[in-house]
Every structure is written in structure tokens, then in C-alpha cells.
Amino acid sequence: LQAYTRASLSAQSFPADLGQRRGSTTGFLPAARLHVRVIRVTVPKIVAEFSMKDDQRRHPLRDAHTDITSVESVPDTAQTRAPAYRLAFTDNEFMCRDELRPVRLQLELLKPEMMLDAEGIVSTIVLFGGSRIPEPAKKDTARTKTLAELSHFYDETREFARLMTLKSRDSGGKEDVIVTGGGPGVMEAGNRGALDAGGHSIGLNIVLPHEQAPNAYVTPELCFNFHYFAIRKMHFLMRAKAICVFPGGFGTMDEMFESLTLIQTGRMQRVPFLLFGKAFWQKIINWDALADAGTISDEDLDLFRFVETAQEAMDLIDNWGTPTTRDSIPGR
């Protein structure tokens, strides 16, 4: 061997081929360039580099885990008990300071990103919907008559997730993976349907005062927890191949309108965007009034479609066509 090629990626945050590798649909990813350098080396150098204790990190430096273990056995003195002596990255009080917020935001972006990459997840089907919608067998426990009437959407969510996961399995479970908020109600139904089909699914949980253990149907290795709503919503969309919105409350509408706004303003490609339950959504939101008032354009009403059943949603997604991105905003 006379030479080997080492490829190095330079980007602000993400690998150079991230958008192509996932079929990314968002405008969040920075531009990146791939630089290839050919380095002349001898055979012994190659062997030494690639056999260093089977170390995949490719460097000879002492790792953080070793130091964490080492400091556990230091003598117990006034100095070693002092907060100043703690390793910065293991010091919870330090990590929770206001000044460390940028670091915490970055960590919440990186951890799920790296773990989803490791699992080979390329694209997702996003399910938004209410946590209070019960399954039909338990609709008698619903807080209101309307929630009981909406319980059939639990079954539609479950069936849609089952059908989509059967399709996902054709790609080895890498494409069209169901992702929910990981909680009860519609979210539970989505993860449950994926499990019905023998596939895996993602849960993006958020720490709330009144909730929530993840529902029992999320794939454990793909069950994440967030402090920041903004980063959680970003992860919902970074691999989104389609977005399905079921009846829900403020949280569902927050997720729905942020996603629609990104598409409307050309910050995200126009992916299939389906609202389950036309009667519910037309009662809750007067879409035509927004267009009549001129606060949105008539063309904005074409960014989404109403559906009632799982099969109808599958058919629309299959026939949606190639995602496009707006280069201007109608009405501006």
C-alpha cells in the first residue's frame, strides 16, 4: 500500500451528506463541503493507526470515561469535596447555570441526532395529536362528550401507523419511521400501531409538570426526553417525509402551525401535510376567514389536505409527488 484516502467533512453542524442521506426536507441544515486529501504513508503507519486498541476514536488521548472513573477514587479532602474540583462536564450545578444554556441546547440537538444516525433512521412520518383522546374501549373515561366522540381517531392513528410501518419494513425500517411525542392519546396510538406491524417507532418526550412517562409502545432505543420545546420540534421535522395532524389542543396546534409556517415561508419543502377530521378542524379554525381577511393567501390553503381514514392518508402520501420548496410567498 502506498497511500490511503482520508475524507474530512467541514460543516457548521452536520455531516456534508446529511440532506442527501436522509432525504431531508427542512431548511435547517447548513451548506457543507467535502474535502478529500490523499496522504502518503507507509504500511506500518496505517497498521498502527487502525489497530490502536481497536479505538474507533482514532486518537491517542485519554478519554473522558477514564477520568470520571479516576476521580471517584481520589482521597476525600476539603479540596476534592469542593465544587470547583468537579470535572465541568459531570458537575450538574455547573451544567444547569443560565450561562450554560447554549451548551444544553446543543446537547439536546446532538444526542438524538447522533443516536438516530447510529440506528440508520433516514426519514420519518410525523404524527401530531391530542394526549387526551382515549382509545374507544376507554371512551367512557373521557372528560368530555367531544373527547369520547373523537376516540375513533385513536384507532385511525393506530391503523395508519401500522400500514406505514409495514411499508417502512420494506426499507429495513430506515425510511418512513413513525415519530410521535411519546405520550398518551394519539401519540400512544401511533407508537402502538408501529409495534402492531412488528416495527420500531420514535418517541420525543418533553418534561412537563403533569406528565409523563413514555407510553409503553415506543421503541426503548428510540425514546428521547427533552427540556426545550424548540429543539424537540426541530427533531420532529429534520427527517420529516410527511406530517399528519390529528385532533388536539394547544400543543398540537403549536406543532401544526410552526410546521405550516416553515412550509409557507419556504423554510421547509412541501411534504404531504394531512389533517385528520375535517369537521373538527373546520370548527376549531376558520381557514377561509384567514384567506378572506388577506392574512394568508388562497394558495396557502393548498398546503394541507383533510382526510378521515388511515387508508385515505396512505393513498394521498403515495400520490403526493416530489416535494417542492417555495421561492416566494403568495400575497406578499
What is the predicted function of each stretch?
Residues 61-75, 79-204:
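Glycine-rich beta-alpha loop segments
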Residues 178-180, 184-246, 250-253, 257:
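Phosphate/pyrophosphate-binding betaalpha-module
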Residues 275-332:
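C-terminal functional extensions of proteins
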Residues 2, 21-22:
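Compositionally biased, intrinsically disordered low-complexity segments enriched in Pro/Arg/Gln/His
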Residues 15-18, 29:
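Short hydrophobic targeting helices and cationic amphipathic motifs
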Residues 198-211, 246, 260-287, 298-299:
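Short, acidic/small-residue loops that bind anionic groups at enzyme active sites
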Residues 19-20, 37-40:
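Short, low-complexity, charge-dense intrinsically disordered segments
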